[in-house]
Amino acid sequence: MLDIKKIRADFDGVAAKLATRGVEKEKLEKLHDLDIKRRELIVKSEALKAERNSVSDEISQVKRAKGDASAQIAAMQKVSAEIKAIDAELAEIEENLNEIIIMLPNLPHESTPIGADEDDNVEVRRVGQTPTFNFEPKAHWDLGEDLGILDWERGGKVTGSRFLFYKGAGARLERALYNFMLDEHGKEGYTEMITPYMVNQESMFGTGQYPKFKEDTFELKDDRGFVLIPTAEVPLTNYYRGEILDGAELPIKFTAMSPSFRSEAGSAGRDTRGLIRLHQFHKVEMVKFAKPDQSYDELEKMTANAENILQKLGLAYRVVALSTGDMGFSAAKTYDLEVWIPAQNTYREISSCSNCEDFQARRAQIRYRDEEGKVQLLHTLNGSGLAVGRTVAAILENYQNEDGSITVPEVLRPYMGGLEVIK
């Protein structure tokens, strides 16, 4: 959530930055007008309350002197009625103001490329060599079905589209990957967590998924309204919701593997086959809590942590800085890691690493106490390290052999009982 004081102090600057994120200036002008009216009413209400207190003192003095206080009582009743009316108007204005501000995206960092969509993203670097084949590489869904390790047909029968069963070596490969990822992040100082897989709506608000992206989630239809997590970012970030941390302990780093549940609203017709876009998938998440002056260094380190996984798996990838028009709602700056998918002859997203600055911390009220004892908002960061199903897809396609078998990357073999080839 944006700081209303910042909008107030630099309206034109904030409006210009938000325009690059598709926010119309009229919406901000409405917010600005409501804020002015709100402050005027607060001043008026406080003046009337001071007047009421003064009249109350007069009534007490008159009564102590056994005099007639009816005039003062009538005056106080009139003032009280005015205060009640102003406070009611103020409550309505604050509700309208809040409805606007909670739907505004984060301000982009100055280094974030300005653009309308993914076509304006900027490639930062490419790492690794894309493989060459002396045969036509198959898509991962065909490889998985032919090997009997991925079963979409029965996943569809049991649940519906965009669901599948991992079977045998497929299930072992998935498990090997997320155990490998967690171990690697543990070496980098991340504390491993197992989170709840359902959260309350306050948690969804804290990280910015609610209310704007409610249609993208699966929500329990009862009086509790719990939500199946779309990413472990939600429970991990909300772990410290409403708390004040010791600045000496920052940065704090968490990692967790969890299922992620997404309705994929608006994705009809996109990636209808394979592991790229599912309603349920495993993901290893990284979350950091950092001091504001250290958060961008921590973003680079987090991105390097995600890259480390791809490098050790021997997968070619590229790093892309997302444009203002393609970046997530809560992010100020985002790097996407895109892995090479041979059958599609392109790079596909496998990780997003973002610095949300104090945007989520303000929504979730996560603060820290600095060396001087001052309490202030910290910065939150999150990143995929990595999306496990997409990593399975990348391994199947990049490590495929002409006979349809899959060579297991060396770093995963200890996690798979020494298995070298899936066939």
From Swiss-Prot:
GO MF term (any one): ATP binding
Binding site for L-serine: 231-233, 285, 384
Keywords from the named record: Aminoacyl-tRNA synthetase, ATP-binding, Cytoplasm, Ligase, Nucleotide-binding, Protein biosynthesis
Localisation: Cytoplasm
InterPro entries linked: aa-tRNA-synt_IIb, aa-tRNA-synth_II, aa-tRNA-synth_II/BPL/LPL, Ser-tRNA-ligase_type_1, Ser-tRNA-synth_1_N, SerRS_1_N_sf, SerRS_core, tRNA-bd_arm
A biological-process GO annotation: seryl-tRNA aminoacylation
GO CC annotations on file: cytoplasm
Domains as described in the record: Consists of two distinct domains, a catalytic core and a N-terminal extension that is involved in tRNA binding.
Family recorded in the similarity comment: Belongs to the class-II aminoacyl-tRNA synthetase family. Type-1 seryl-tRNA synthetase subfamily.
Stated role: Catalyzes the attachment of serine to tRNA(Ser). Is also able to aminoacylate tRNA(Sec) with serine, to form the misacylated tRNA L-seryl-tRNA(Sec), which will be further converted into selenocysteinyl-tRNA(Sec).
Protein name: Serine--tRNA ligase
Organism: Lactococcus lactis subsp. lactis (strain IL1403)
Gene assigned in the entry: serS
